[in-house]
Each structure stands twice: as structure tokens, then as C-alpha cells.
Design a protein with these regions (language model features):
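Helix-coil boundary and interhelical linker segments in multi-pass alpha-helical membrane proteins
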Residues: 1-8, 52-64, 99-110
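Mid-chain, well-packed structural core segment of small domains
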Residues: 56-81
Length: 110
């Protein structure tokens, strides 16, 4: 598979995970705040796991899925802490997808 093809698949997976598979409750409650139905960390972990699963399925590399899970949670945690806004948040996510595509093709030779 070519880099651009894998990158496009990962980007589509990202938008699926961030917009189609993340409901309003998860989007609100993955950040610390009052009146949550579950502790915020549960929501953030679940959201990161969705993204990790998508990356693992698309690349066939569970280790990249685990890396995505952790990196996605850290990026979203930074946004929750108001370290940056949505454009920076999404740019960091997109950059991570480029890194996963490169690693999949160069290191893991998918």
C-alpha cells in the first residue's frame, strides 16, 4: 500500500471516530467537569480506545493501535485543559496519523 492511500484511510478513520462514533455525551464528559454520568477518565479512555481500534484495524498492527490510544488521549487531555483549541487539537491528531502511516510502511513493512 502506498503512503498516501494509508494516510487517507487513517484520516477517514479519525473523522469517523471523532465525529460519527463520538456522541455528545462522550464529547462533553471526556473532560473534567461537574455532573458527569461516569468519571471523565472513563469517557476519555473509551474515546481513545475507539481511535486505537480503528488504527489497529486499518494498519493490521496492534502496537500502532495502542500508540494511537495513548497519543489520542494525551492530545484530547491537552485540549480539555485548554492548552490549545480545536485547530491545534486536530492538527496534532492528523500529524499522528501521518506518523502511524510512515511507521506502518517503513518499520512494519505493511
Amino acid at each position: 500500500m502506498e503512503f498516501i492511500n494509508l494516510l487517507l484511510l487513517l484520516l477517514m478513520g479519525h473523522f469517523l471516530g471523532d465525529f460519527a462514533l463520538q456522541n455528545g455525551r462522550m464529547a462533553r464528559e471526556k473532560c473534567p467537569g461537574p455532573n458527569h454520568s461516569l468519571p471523565w477518565g472513563h469517557w476519555l479512555t473509551a474515546h481513545g480506545a475507539i481511535h486505537g481500534l480503528i488504527v489497529a484495524l486499518l494498519t493490521g498492527i496492534p502496537l500502532l493501535g495502542l500508540a494511537e490510544w495513548l497519543v489520542h488521549m494525551l492530545i484530547d487531555w491537552g485540549k480539555c485543559r485548554n492548552l490549545y483549541r480545536l485547530p491545534v487539537d486536530q492538527s496534532l491528531h492528523l500529524a499522528s496519523k501521518a506518523i502511524w502511516a510512515l511507521l506502518a510502511l517503513v518499520v512494519f513493512a505493511v
